[in-house]
Regions:
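C-terminal catalytic "cap/lid" subdomain
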Residues: 2-288
């Protein structure tokens, strides 16, 4: 796959570029012949965070096998709990959280603080050196207001992969909270599924895994659908069979298809789900 450029807009195509001459050296030759680690983007859903030990053990196992994980996390369940404590009622439109100014303060605090650091701490305890950041750091996620009906919710307009690449180059695992920044410096809440899809596409990841609290995409009889074409996925969304929080997951997977090797929606509650999927034994839904 073509290496990711530092700045990537969702509508970008990968430009052709000429090779730049490099000085001859033993170190340069060794670096050039060393194969790049397969990069996978893993979205850990807020609904599975209370039971995320197995998923993180899978992440640690993949990392030890020479695979480079980039983690994007949600935190919806915990955000709702903290909003309830403040007497703020959570509202959703088309599976996306409505975010006003008061809600945004809680979203930013919970995602970038509590949830992010819990995940980083857990990974560190599993022997994985992880660093917690958000889409605001280094301008990783640039966004604009997605829909006035949703309030301070962002549509990603640009992904700056340079800070992520820097963390990876240092031998660390990035753990990213989905908060973005607009041109006017306003922070915006970004759906974690959307953020994961945009980051996976910008980095030309080999795989995109969405971990959630259901088996995968289900049909009208609540049976798991092992694989969906783009047309089938859109039909399920248009008919309402796939609704709620599954819609942004499917849309993110579909949008990433042109740049990502494979996209999967998996049950993050099932022990070994992530490892099985990477080894070709997925029990969720593959998109594309």
């Amino acid at each position: 796959m073509t290496p990711a450029s530092p700045l990537h807009s969702p509508s970008d195509t990968v430009p052709e570029h000429s090779e730049q001459p490099m000085p001859e050296s033993a170190d340069a030759t060794e670096a050039a012949t060393e194969p790049a680690k397969p990069l996978v983007v893993i979205k850990i859903g807020g609904s599975t965070l209370g039971e995320h030990d197995t998923s993180l053990k899978d992440v640690a196992a993949l990392h030890k096998q020479g695979i480079q994980p980039v983690i994007v996390h949600g935190g919806g369940k915990i955000i709702t709990e903290w909003m309830d404590r403040q007497g703020i009622r959570a509202k959703f439109v088309r599976g996306l959280r409505v975010t006003d100014a008061a809600s945004l303060d809680i979203v930013v605090a919970v995602l970038t603080g509590l949830v992010n650091k819990q995940l980083v701490n857990s990974l560190n305890n599993l022997g994985v050196s992880a660093v917690g950041i958000s889409g605001v750091d280094g301008g990783i996620l640039r966004a604009e207001i997605q829909d006035p009906e949703l309030g301070l919710v962002g549509r990603v307009t640009q992904v700056n992969v340079a800070p992520i690449q820097g963390i990876i180059s240092a031998g660390l695992v990035p753990v990213i909270a989905p908060v973005a920044v607009a041109k006017n410096a306003q922070m915006l809440n970004v759906n974690a599924d959307v953020a994961a899809g945009e980051i996976a596409a910008a980095m030309s990841a080999s795989r995109l895994f969405m971990l959630t609290d259901v088996e995968g995409v289900l049909d009208t009889s609540k049976r798991l659908i092992p694989r969906l074409t783009e047309r089938q996925a859109r039909s399920l969304m248009n008919s309402g069979i796939a609704g709620g929080g599954m819609v942004p997951k499917l849309e993110a997977c579909l949008k990433a298809l042109g740049s990502v090797g494979e996209t999967h929606i998996l049950d993050g509650r099932r022990p070994g789900a992530l490892l099985d999927a990477y080894e070709g034994n997925a029990r969720g839904t593959r998109i594309g």
